[in-house]
Amino acid sequence: MGSRPFTKNPAPMMLTIRVALVLSCICPANSIDGRPFAAAGIVVTGDKAVNIYTSSQTGSIIVKLLPNLPKDKEACAKAPLDAYNRTLTTLLTPLGDSIRRIQESVTTSGGGRQGRLIGAIIGGVALGVATAAQITAAAALIQAKQNAANILRLKESIAATNEAVHEVTDGLSQLAVAVGKMQQFVNDQFNKTAQELDCIKIAQQVGVELNLYLTELTTVFGPQITSPALNKLTIQALYNLAGGNMDYLLTKLGIGNNQLSSLIGSGLITGNPILYDSQTQLLGIQVTLPSVGNLNNMRATYLETLSVSTTRGFASALVPKVVTQVGSVIEELDTSYCIETDLDLYCTRIVTFPMSPGIYSCLSGNTSACMYSKTEGALTTPYMTIKGSVIANCKMTTCRCVNPPGIISQNYGEAVSLIDKQSCNVLSLGGITLRLSGEFDVTYQKNISIQDSQVIITGNLDISTELGNVNNSISNALNKLEESNRKLDKVNVKLTSTSALITYIVLTIISLVFGILSLILACYLMYKQKAQQKTLLWLGNNTLDQMRATTKM
């Protein structure tokens, strides 16, 4: 991952650094515990320390390409030295010419604005076809012009020294170290040995070593044929030029051994050629080093997801790739401003994003809050190794245990299978055989199931299918609406006016009142009729009794 350009406004960056430092001082850093959600297909792959850097330090290396031999041995090595000198001049003259063209293109006439404008135009012509990065390198080369001139002023004394490492400070605005890889070889082979060597052996040894160094020079400057002065030299190239003497400059600039290996892997230590003098065979390189600030209490945690098995098919968890935790706060970390090494992140700024409550709860160990996206691709990751063990989706791939032999089955509803040496010593996954040495302890949650409500649609094809279903539902609703409109069109609008409705309501109420009164009257008449019938019946019975009594008498 490449680094982003440095910000033009330092204020936001300083504010970010201060906020990060304050946060790092308040709470101790906690690494996210991946054991609760490993069985849910979310795996913590590692942590890295987070650092802030700016490319603010510079120093110069003056590479002495032509060694000084002892006086009594100069004649023996004259032939290989002359051939080496000619080859050096042929190889590096385009580099020196390119440097001079760019540096001389900024000469001004009279020091006014017009002169600077003309110089800028000539500089653009001198660059030819250049990328933005090469234009930036050209600007740095122009800024180093005075320092290169000061080095050239001391070139005779630098070329005359027999020291392999020599610090140059006279009249220079920055630290400069003269190093000679070939001079180191001469000193080790001839100046510090009491063994007498014949002339032929001296010539052979010098010739072989010079040829090897020429090969290294060709390797270093081979990619710079098109724009020899504008391409950066990597730290590996600088070590090829200076040998072990490169460490002297780095130590002087404050790079400790504990940072050196990480910074070398980051690619932040680079160099740009600023001069080449064919007369003395001196090559000047300006080295740029980062100024690093360590955020001791901030770490970046990397997450990877597996394809898990659900009742709706295979799915992968929706979580950030990188998160950072300070205290109890977990946020997504944007690494686009960072350069990664094996153990560190070097960032020009710290940019984090808050996460939704669901993802926060998921990464805190609540797997029921994790959301998943359907994944049906053939390249979806079905398994992953972690600390000598394996987390695998044995429904997506065949988990064959070689020792002891058997097929590892995954229970219905189980998201993934956690396989360690307790269950299988040698495991075969899709033709890949792994010997397991780790073990999942009791802190790892197992037999986690993913509910249907946790699986959402995010793939383009799935979304298209769902949209098609929605469109069909909308079409059906529109058809029903049109049918309803047709029925409403048949209704007489005049009968549905407000006055008509009021009349209908009043008439309905009157009808109800009359109906109720009629019902009451009918009930009264029926009651009265029954009463009359009872009276007549009583009178009839009474008369009959009197007649019976008279007859008996």
Curated annotation (Swiss-Prot):
Q: Which residues lie on this side of the membrane: Cytoplasmic?
A: 522-553
State the annotated membrane topology for this chain.
Single-pass type I membrane protein; Single-pass membrane protein
Question: Which sequence ranges are marked TM in the entry?
Answer: 501-521
Give residue spans on the Extracellular membrane side: 31-500
Modification after translation is described as: The inactive precursor F0 is glycosylated and proteolytically cleaved into F1 and F2 to be functionally active. The cleavage is mediated by cellular proteases during the transport and maturation of the polypeptide.
User: What are the annotated GO cellular component locations?
Assistant: host cell plasma membrane; membrane; viral envelope; virion membrane
Q: Which positions make up the signal peptide?
A: 1-31
Q: Answer whether the UniProt record assigns the keyword Cytoplasm to this protein.
A: no
Coiled coil regions, renumbered to chain = 463-499
Q: Which UniProt keywords apply?
A: Coiled coil, Disulfide bond, Fusion of virus membrane with host cell membrane, Fusion of virus membrane with host membrane, Glycoprotein, Host cell membrane, Host membrane, Lipoprotein, Membrane, Palmitate, Signal, Transmembrane, Transmembrane helix, Viral envelope protein, Viral penetration into host cytoplasm, Virion, Virus entry into host cell
Highest rank taxon of the organism: Viruses
Q: A Pfam family name for this chain?
A: Fusion_gly
Q: What is its main location?
A: virion
Annotated GO biological processes are: fusion of virus membrane with host plasma membrane; symbiont entry into host cell
Which positions are glycosylated? N85, N191, N366, N447, N471
Compartment(s) of residence: Virion membrane; Host cell membrane
Question: What intrachain disulfides are recorded?
Answer: C76-C199, C338-C347, C362-C370, C394-C399, C401-C424
Attached lipid, kind S-palmitoyl cysteine, located at C523
> Member of which family?
Belongs to the paramyxoviruses fusion glycoprotein family.
Q: What does this protein do?
A: Class I viral fusion protein. Under the current model, the protein has at least 3 conformational states: pre-fusion native state, pre-hairpin intermediate state, and post-fusion hairpin state. During viral and plasma cell membrane fusion, the heptad repeat (HR) regions assume a trimer-of-hairpins structure, positioning the fusion peptide in close proximity to the C-terminal region of the ectodomain. The formation of this structure appears to drive apposition and subsequent fusion of viral and plasma cell membranes.
Describe the protein's quaternary organization and the partners it interacts with.
Homotrimer of disulfide-linked F1-F2.
Q: What is this protein called?
A: Fusion glycoprotein F0
